[in-house]
Amino acid sequence: MKKNRLNLNGVVVINKTQGLSSNKVLQKLKYLFNAQKAGHTGTLDPMATGVLPICFGRATKIAQYLLDSDKEYIATIKLGIETDSGDAEGEIIAKNADIPELTVEYLETVLAKFRGDIVQIPPMYSALKHNGQPLYKLAREGKAIEVKPRNINIYELELLEFNTDSLKIRVKCSKGTYIRSLAIDIGKALGCGGHLIALQRTQSGPFRIETALDLDNLKDLSFEQKLASIASVESVFIDKPIYSLVEEEKDDLYKRGLFADKSHLDGTVRIYDDEKFVAIAEFDKGKLISKKFFDQDIFISE
């Protein structure tokens, strides 16, 4: 007989290991927690490691917020070799032994070109779609598609270390940034080509690698300890301003939007009712527009 699955609500932040797909992590976690409903917040390639938030129950409503949030990565780029996928899992398509002499000054000059608002072309080996078909499938079929460039923001780009044919960087970036494309572009800017050989996501939204859980360690926990590892839905918005409703404002917020003269409000706002987190709203031009509602029970519902 199938075990009744639990209606869990919240977020578990996993430190994904190399070789596992994001969907495999999702299925393992769903099994470990015996959860009814679960979803991840954007894939990490199997070769990548690091922060992968998994949403349970009502938290799946806000997965898009995490998908759209800023990210931070540690990336290692191998110079002088290009691959069709832009990473170590692809086929080698070009080699160039003429790697320039790398110095801190030279690398900083090149990296400066990639800081701030830039235009990036996503890699063909990606889940983006063209006429309903994932680009990676078209790439495997040998079909060349013109991929549209997109505007992204590299907030921080720090050189961590380098040697004669590789460099390690820390990248803090906006949604939609492909680190493989960044590796390719940096290789081109250095005149020798390059590809990504290691990638660790160290932050996704408010969640950092320091507090992420290893799957193997999670397996050894008691079920009560597993439940205690679930972060509340509210934790996704912990850095957002708060607005506390009074009774006469509820109807306006729920139905039409609420005008609120509050200078501290901006963008996404946490809504409280009787000291309980009940919704998120967007504040724009003096008006709160509700976006998502949540029940009071954040963890387990009967």
UniProtKB/Swiss-Prot annotation:
Major enzyme class: isomerase
One Pfam family of this chain: TruB_C_2
Catalysed reaction equations from the record: uridine(55) in tRNA = pseudouridine(55) in tRNA
Gene Ontology MF term list: RNA binding; tRNA pseudouridine(55) synthase activity
Keyword Signal: no
Keyword tRNA processing: yes
Annotated EC: 5.4.99.25
Keywords noted in UniProt: Isomerase, tRNA processing
Function: Responsible for synthesis of pseudouridine from uracil-55 in the psi GC loop of transfer RNAs.
Protein name: tRNA pseudouridine synthase B
The species this protein was found in: Francisella philomiragia subsp. philomiragia (strain ATCC 25017 / CCUG 19701 / FSC 153 / O#319-036)
